[in-house]
From Swiss-Prot:
Species this protein is from: Lactococcus lactis subsp. cremoris (strain SK11)
Name of the top EC class for this enzyme: oxidoreductase
Positions of the KARI C-terminal knotted domain: 183-328
SUPFAM superfamilies attached to this UniProt entry: 6-phosphogluconate dehydrogenase C-terminal domain-like (SSF48179), NAD(P)-binding Rossmann-fold domains (SSF51735)
Catalytic activity: (2R)-2,3-dihydroxy-3-methylbutanoate + NADP(+) = (2S)-2-acetolactate + NADPH + H(+); (2R,3R)-2,3-dihydroxy-3-methylpentanoate + NADP(+) = (S)-2-ethyl-2-hydroxy-3-oxobutanoate + NADPH + H(+)
Needed cofactors: Mg(2+)
Residues that, per the record, bind Mg(2+) 2: 191, 227, 231
Protein name, as recorded: Ketol-acid reductoisomerase (NADP(+))
Function per UniProt: Involved in the biosynthesis of branched-chain amino acids (BCAA). Catalyzes an alkyl-migration followed by a ketol-acid reduction of (S)-2-acetolactate (S2AL) to yield (R)-2,3-dihydroxy-isovalerate. In the isomerase reaction, S2AL is rearranged via a Mg-dependent methyl migration to produce 3-hydroxy-3-methyl-2-ketobutyrate (HMKB). In the reductase reaction, this 2-ketoacid undergoes a metal-dependent reduction by NADPH to yield (R)-2,3-dihydroxy-isovalerate.
Gene3D superfamilies attached to this UniProt entry: 6.10.240.10, NAD(P)-binding Rossmann-like Domain (3.40.50.720)
Encoding gene per record: ilvC
Similarity-based family: Belongs to the ketol-acid reductoisomerase family.
Entry annotation: catalytic residues: 108
Matching InterPro entries: 6-PGluconate_DH-like_C_sf, KARI, KARI_C, KARI_N, KARI_prok, NAD(P)-bd_dom_sf
Length: 340
C-alpha cells in the first residue's frame, strides 16, 4: 500500500504556537523532544518524578515539575515515559489534571492501542513516533536535518489533533526528512513485530545460533565472534545506505552466491510460519498482557532473561575483544546512558 510522505512545507498550521507544552519523562526520547522543541521556539516544561531525570532536566535549563503539576499547566502533553510505567502515571498524575480541550501525545501506541490508557472524549490524542532512538533524534536535529517519523491523529476532539501532530513532528525536526501518517494499531503492531521477529529477537537468536554452531564445531570463539557479530554492522550499514542491492554490490561474488543459496535454508517456510504466530500474539494482545503481567509481578521473567543473556559465552568474549577496539564505542552511547 502506497503512503504519502509529508515535509515541513506541508505543515501549514502552527498548531503549537502560543501553547504550553509538557513533556512527561526525560529519558532517551524525552530529552530529545524537549530540547528540539525548545530550539524550535516552543514553550516547553518537563513533568517527571523526583530523581536523576528530574535533576538532569533542571540542569538542562527546563522548568521542571512533578507530573501532575506539569499536566495542569499545559495545553499539549507528550507522554514519553517507558511503556510499562505509562498506565500508572496516567491514572495517578495525568488523568486528574487533564483539561478539556487539551492534547495528549505518545511516541508509541502500546498503551492506547491495547486499552491500558483510556482518554476522555474531550481531549485530543495524537502520536509522533520518530524512527530512531532519542540520542539520534537530538543529534540529527542539531546537525540540521532529522529522522523520519510516523504521526497519528487518533482522537480529534478539538478538530486540531492532526495539525498538532504534524507541527510537533516539524518542531522536533522529523518533517525535515519526511513523516508518514498511520494509525495507533499499525504503528504498534508493526513496531512490536519488527523488534521481536527481526531487529532484536530474530537477530540476536540468529547470531547466537551461528556462534554456537561454530564453537561446537571447535572453531575459536574469538573468530566466531568476528564472523557472526562484529561484521554484522558492516553489512547492516550497507543495507541502511542502499538496501540489499548496495550490500550485494559491495560484497564478494562468493559471499553473494552464498547469500542466495543459503539464506532460504536458514529462513525456511517454517520460520515464516513462526513469524506469523508471533504477529498473531501481538495482534491479539497476548504479548502485551504477558509483558504487563510480568512488570506487575516485579519482572521475574525479564530479570531471568537478562541474567541468562549476560552469561552467554559470546557476550563474555565480545566484551574482551571490544577492549582492544575503542572505535566500537561512541559518544552516542554516553548520551543514551545519560538519558535512559
Amino acid at each position: 500500500m502506497a503512503v504519502t510522505m509529508y515535509y515541513e512545507e506541508d505543515v501549514e498550521v502552527a498548531a503549537l504556537a502560543g501553547k504550553k507544552i509538557a513533556v512527561i519523562g526525560y529519558g532517551s526520547q524525552g530529552h530529545a523532544h524537549a530540547q528540539n522543541l525548545r530550539d524550535s521556539g516552543h514553550d516547553v516544561i518537563i513533568g517527571v518524578r523526583q530523581g536523576k531525570s528530574f535533576d538532569r532536566a533542571k540542569e538542562d535549563g527546563f522548568e521542571t515539575f512533578e507530573v501532575g503539576e506539569a499536566v495542569a499547566k499545559a495545553d499539549v502533553i507528550m507522554v514519553l515515559a517507558p511503556d510499562e510505567l505509562q498506565q500508572s502515571i496516567y491514572e495517578e498524575d495525568i488523568k486528574p489534571n487533564l483539561k478539556s480541550g487539551s492534547a495528549l501525545g505518545f511516541a508509541h501506541g502500546f498503551n492506547i492501542h491495547f486499552g491500558y490508557i483510556e482518554v476522555p472524549e474531550d481531549v485530543d490524542v495524537f502520536m509522533v513516533a520518530p524512527k530512531a532512538p532519542g540520542h539520534l533524534v537530538r543529534r540529527t536535529f542539531t546537525e540540521g536535518f532529522g529522522t523520519p517519523a510516523l504521526f497519528v491523529s487518533h482522537q480529534n476532539a478539538t478538530g486540531h489533533a492532526r495539525e498538532i501532530a504534524m507541527d510537533w513532528a516539524k518542531g522536533i525536526g522529523c518533517a525535515r526528512v519526511g513523516i508518514i501518517e498511520t494509525t495507533f494499531k499499525e504503528e504498534t503492531e508493526e513496531d512490536l513485530f519488527g523488534e521481536q521477529a527481526v531487529l532484536c529477537g530474530g537477530l540476536t537468536a540468529l547470531v547466537e545460533a551461528g556462534f554456537e554452531t561454530l564453537t561446537e564445531a571447535r572453531y575459536a570463539g574469538e573468530l566466531a565472534y568476528f564472523e557472526v557479530l562484529h561484521e554484522m554492522k558492516l553489512i547492516v550499514d550497507l543495507m541502511y545506505e542502499g538496501g540489499f542491492t548496495k550490500m550485494r554490490q559491495s560484497i564478494s561474488n562468493t559471499a553473494e552466491f552464498g547469500d542466495y543459496v543459503t539464506g532460504p535454508r536458514i529462513i525456511t517456510d517454517e520460520v515464516k510460519k513462526n513469524m506469523k504466530l508471533v504477529l498473531a500474539d501481538i495482534q491479539s494482545g497476548k504479548f502485551a498482557q504477558d509483558f504487563v503481567d510480568d512488570f506487575k509481578a516485579g519482572r521475574p521473567k525479564l530479570t531471568a532473561y537478562r541474567e541468562a543473556a549476560k552469561n552467554l559465552e559470546i557476550e563474555k568474549i565480545g566484551a574482551e575483544l571490544r577492549k582492544a577496539m575503542p572505535f566500537t564505542q561512541s559518544g552516542d552511547d554516553d548520551a543514551f546512558k545519560i538519558y535512559q
